[in-house]
């Protein structure tokens, strides 16, 4: 049975039931040696390696995740000044009245992004940006890092 084998090397687990490795939204069975090898790899590389042997758990989810990761990098916004990629930071609320003495004071949510090359800082409307599934993935990835 496929669940009794390491997804990455195809070997049967040892005496200690070994472990699982997170590949996208799925947990894949792995032996201790493969887990050590996969520790430094990116999510994309782990997903690709899980599909090689053809015994991965939920391979369709892995393929969807690979497509999401590769397409999202193509959708990453570029800096208007130098053309480098922008990196998102956590969503923030800008407040017109810092003392908040009135419940009617103006405030709005923004999604900041910055350029690591030239330092330019841009603000995006989070409601609009999060509608694009590729950008939503990038936001989650950047803000968790």
Residue spans of the language-model regions?
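Short metal-binding segments enriched for Cys and/or His
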Residues: 32-53, 106-131
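Compact soluble domain cores
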Residues: 68-94
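Short linker/helix segments within small regulatory modules
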Residues: 18-28, 95-112
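Short Cys/His-rich Zn2+-coordinating modules
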Residues: 11-19, 54-69, 95-102
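A short, surface-exposed interaction/processing loop segment used at functional sites
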Residues: 126-145
């Amino acid at each position: 049975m496929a669940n009794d084998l390491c997804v990455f090397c195809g070997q049967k687990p040892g005496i200690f039931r070994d472990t699982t490795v997170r590949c996208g939204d799925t947990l894949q069975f792995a032996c201790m040696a493969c887990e050590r090898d996969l520790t430094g790899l990116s999510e994309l590389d782990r997903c690709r390696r899980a599909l090689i042997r053809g015994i991965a758990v939920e391979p369709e989810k892995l393929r969807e995740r690979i497509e999401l990761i590769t397409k999202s990098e193509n959708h990453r916004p570029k800096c208007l000044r130098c053309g480098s990629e922008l990196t998102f930071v956590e969503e923030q609320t800008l407040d017109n009245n810092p003392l908040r003495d009135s419940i009617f004071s103006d405030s709005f949510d923004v999604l900041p992004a910055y350029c690591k090359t030239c330092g330019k800082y841009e603000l995006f409307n989070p409601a609009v940006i999060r509608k694009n599934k590729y950008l939503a993935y990038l936001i989650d990835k950047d803000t968790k890092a």
